[in-house]
């Protein structure tokens, strides 16, 4: 029988970090259960190939939403990594911690000990920041963070246009000042994707006390209200991986609630409907699903300097060859090298809109490239009020769950997205883009009225692939909480959840960084260590926030 002190389900952002930290002192054995295969190969390791694994069943679980009623019945893909490193091996390699206020809101909502002062030391501990170490940034940690070269002049035009429009500039949105236009950070090292597997799991697996077990996690085995192991399917056989101390679920915001429900933890009525014996009635399991949505605002470029010139087989082959032999060139970046975090209106105290800018006009998944040279901004609101759910389709562990995001179900979502479109047009209309600006490709200059913008939003808004919140962390006496502030599943001993599913609220940006931080901090709770000393750093808040949006 396979057996270890700690059994972790999932080798993603949080799971890999926990495998590394729980085994670090050599006193405890760790087994990581992962259904996916190897991350070796250029399709994952070459940063510019980022859209390819998203569309491959080899690396992606292939989840999709139910038809979304507020998006004309569209079904939206929900990629989650089915590979060593989890979603950190198929994501966009964008590194965003989130705003300090995000974590303070977590604490206010019952996640005591997870305010910004508490989590900043863990962000610092995990970082190997190219820019060095200070009160805000870390250096020497497992996760390499860099900035792109920003050689293409369109990156500079985007940042300058933000300044011309009256917005702030920021040299480090992961430092004291998130608000503003500036460089974007990447989890890339030496021209390669630097996933959680590269940073944490592979170094951990070199230790004698860490093992990786390839298998499909069916459920957590619970006896007398205590988790004692995990039932897996491996080599077409059902096996048990026994946990001497604890089981930690880190299987993503989609799979983590599914595994809990299959184990008898969740809304009692829903479990009974599926013929599952109730171990712990936790109504919050699978609820509180959140995500970011975004639109692509695309503009023709009058100069042939965009990436559209290399979106052909011959150019891709040359780029691939240069990357393969030298780990350099256009293949060695994700091309997200300029960013912005801005506030939508006066009275909003910290940014609620995020921009990714790239010198190309093409969908994030690599499809539907524009016919001409172009550039685009990915833009979307960061704090949607819409909430969704993940439920069981059947008691069969192999059945994909029912995912209902309820995108755009709150009226404010529509107001915010209309503003995002109009604001992007204002930015692209600044003189910094005069030398490059052609016709608007998308939505198109004819799309102006609220009604027309709403049609465009309904037909074209996409997930930014940041699902979270389905095993919410909070007070033990809150019926909507699934785990307490030490990541312990309420009502079951020896069982924790630690990944993006425990976020009470979605953070202000991409989720890889806060997911890794969650694994880092959860490890100290699991080991019974005193948490790292809180920081006394104070974030920059725009002094004009009450009277101006910039």
UniProtKB/Swiss-Prot annotation:
It is an enzyme of class 1 (oxidoreductase). The active site is at residue 466. Pathway: Amine and polyamine biosynthesis; betaine biosynthesis via choline pathway; betaine aldehyde from choline (cytochrome c reductase route): step 1/1. It comes from the Bacteria. PROSITE patterns: GMC_OXRED_1, GMC_OXRED_2. Involved in the biosynthesis of the osmoprotectant glycine betaine. Catalyzes the oxidation of choline to betaine aldehyde and betaine aldehyde to glycine betaine at the same rate. Its EC number is 1.1.99.1, 1.2.1.8. One of its GO terms (molecular function) is betaine-aldehyde dehydrogenase (NAD+) activity. FAD binds at residues 5-34. Belongs to the GMC oxidoreductase family. It catalyses: choline + A = betaine aldehyde + AH2; betaine aldehyde + NAD(+) + H2O = glycine betaine + NADH + 2 H(+). Pfam families: GMC_oxred_C, GMC_oxred_N. The gene is betA. The lineage of its organism: Bacteria, Pseudomonadati, Pseudomonadota, Alphaproteobacteria, Hyphomicrobiales. Its cofactor is FAD. This is Oxygen-dependent choline dehydrogenase. GO terms for biological process: glycine betaine biosynthetic process from choline. It comes from Mesorhizobium japonicum (strain LMG 29417 / CECT 9101 / MAFF 303099). InterPro entries: BetA, FAD/NAD-bd_sf, GMC_OxRdtase, GMC_OxRdtase_N, GMC_OxRtase_C. Residues 529-550 are annotated as: Disordered. Keywords: FAD, Flavoprotein, NAD, Oxidoreductase.
